[in-house]
């Protein structure tokens, strides 16, 4: 049996905002150099800065985050983070980003850990506030993430766009690279279809428990770390968001982000 421990932090005035502001929140950005489709992508130049710096700066703009740390096992990435004045921790080599985060979180004194992917240079700081809000509303929430409605048909069949189905209480039922749910009878019309926005927040204790658990068959089959939590019975609160995610997975993705950030409205 997995037992998750948590601490209830009373709000100073009883509001969700006050409760969140009373929590010590650390944002961790896992970054690795190796990538089958785009090696070295954290250091890829985007508008004169490495991608990891764009992510770091945007996360640092969140007023609820006390500290931002890049977690990497690569000295080249660590050196570049030091050069732009960021905080970085060198870790052991890990199979997953969750395990990398847990190594760093074990050394931290904080309430919540926010996991921001190192290949999301367009991350909006407002998304962090949305992911953290459920912890103030419900002390039983251990892990949160975000999702939004699919608007482009191509996203449904793209395996790099992870789909999610959510129960009536707002908890994730399943994540998949395949289209879910399956529409057996087209005459009934499609229900709302949602994609996962890959930002997570954890109570520190929950992250440590999750990292201690064995990888699971579905996690390996889909190559989705969040399925480890679901298979072990850890519920993930899913929050619908207006913010989108744009992970850089391919050279084509990188060129698109470069165009967006080179435009005046997209300047970082």
Q: Where in the sequence are the language-model features?
A:
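N-terminal amphipathic/basic-hydrophobic helices that include classical n-h-c signal peptides
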Residues: 1-19
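Conserved alpha/beta core of the MobA/IspD/sugar-nucleotide pyrophosphorylase nucleotidyltransferase superfamily
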Residues: 18, 189-268
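Short, high-confidence coil segments that cap the C-terminus of an alpha-helix
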Residues: 65, 110, 138-141, 234
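Short phosphate-binding loop-to-helix
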Residues: 69, 75-133
């Amino acid at each position: 049996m997995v037992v998750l421990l948590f601490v209830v932090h009373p709000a100073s005035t009883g509001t969700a905002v006050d409760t969140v502001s009373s929590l010590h929140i650390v944002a961790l950005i896992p970054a690795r150099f190796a990538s089958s489709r785009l090696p070295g992508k954290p250091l890829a130049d985007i508008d004169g800065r490495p991608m990891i710096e764009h992510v770091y700066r945007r996360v640092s703009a969140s007023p609820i985050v006390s500290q931002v740390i890049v977690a990497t096992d690569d000295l080249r990435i660590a050196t570049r983070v030091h050069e732009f004045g960021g905080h970085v921790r060198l870790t052991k080599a890990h199979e997953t980003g969750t395990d990398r985060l847990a190594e760093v979180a074990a050394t931290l004194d904080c309430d919540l850990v926010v996991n921001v992917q190192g290949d999301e240079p367009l991350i909006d700081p407002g998304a962090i506030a949305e992911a953290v809000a459920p912890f103030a509303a419900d002390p039983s929430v251990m892990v949160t993430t975000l999702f939004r409605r699919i608007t482009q048909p191509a996203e449904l069949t793209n395996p790099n766009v992870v789909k999610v189905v959510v129960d009536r209480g707002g908890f994730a039922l399943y994540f998949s690279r395949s289209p879910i749910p399956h529409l057996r009878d087209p005459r009934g019309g499609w229900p709302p279809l949602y994609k996962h926005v890959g930002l997570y927040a954890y109570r520190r204790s929950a992250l440590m428990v999750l990292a201690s658990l064995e990888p699971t068959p579905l996690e390996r089959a889909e190559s989705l770390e969040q399925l480890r939590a679901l298979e072990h019975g850890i519920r993930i609160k899913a929050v619908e968001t207006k913010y989108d995610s744009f992970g850089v997975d391919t050279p084509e993705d990188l060129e698109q982000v470069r165009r967006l950030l080179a435009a005046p409205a997209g300047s970082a």
